Design a protein with these regions (language model features):
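Gly/Pro-enriched, hydrophobic low-complexity segments
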Residues: 150-214
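An acidic-aromatic
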Residues: 88-138
Length: 214
């Protein structure tokens, strides 16, 4: 499935917030922390990539926090995002511009649940419909848990292209294109700092500010 960020305290067309949200998003990009230079040579990264990819695909727990900007056709919004992975359970918290509104999405083996800014809890088809309504498209949640870490979803075939440093630079998978423009050094090695997920007229940009794992 795919993810959608809250546009306001109540669901309403995202185009009402497009201009202001994108202006805030562009302004906020100026204060993004600089990526740390990689500690391994490109040759070392390429040689170790199969093992590194398998390690990240099997990674059971992590937390990523940062900013999200979405354009879906003529609509768009930006906000804060917090992704918590615990085994097969993904919990995504999204806050709209200036902290207005908040949506909590949980995706696991039992299905999808969504809590609206008003506290209403939805599940199954109702949660899916609300998610698509708020996002403007159906986000690939099952794959995003891997893409955000800079690796392909092991459940689907994909085409990988390395960057100049030997890390994953772009990925074509399940009709989506993932482009990673910057990495940052963390306690778990190099992980994406800036990435874009796109398909058709949908573009999701993520700027990860902090990574954490137990």
């Amino acid at each position: 499935m795919t993810v959608r960020t809250p546009a306001a305290a109540t669901a309403r067309p995202l185009h009402l917030l497009l201009c202001g949200a994108l202006a805030l998003w562009l302004a906020g990009c100026q204060s993004v922390p600089k990526a740390i230079a990689p500690t391994a040579t490109p040759e070392q990264v390429v040689a170790g990539w199969p093992a590194r990819r398998a390690q990240l695909q099997a990674r059971a727990q992590f937390t990523a926090q940062g900013r999200i900007g979405v354009v879906a056709g003529a609509d768009g919004f930006n906000g804060r995002v917090r992704w918590v992975q615990d085994g097969a359970r993904s919990t995504v918290s999204l806050d709209g511009p200036l902290g207005v509104g908040g949506v909590r999405i949980v995706n696991d083996a039992t299905g999808l649940t969504l809590t609206t800014p008003s506290g209403e809890a939805l599940d199954s088809q109702a949660a899916h419909d609300e998610l698509v309504k708020r996002m403007g498209f159906e986000p690939p949640l099952d794959s995003l848990r891997y893409w955000v870490q800079g690796v392909p979803d092991p459940a689907s075939p994909g085409s990988e292209t390395p960057d100049a440093q030997g890390y994953l630079g772009s990925l074509a998978q399940s009709g989506w294109t993932v482009t990673i423009s910057a990495y940052m050094q963390t306690q778990d090695g190099a992980l994406p700092q800036k990435l874009t997920v796109a398909r058709g007229d949908v573009r999701v940009r993520l700027i990860i500010e902090t990574w954490h794992s137990p």
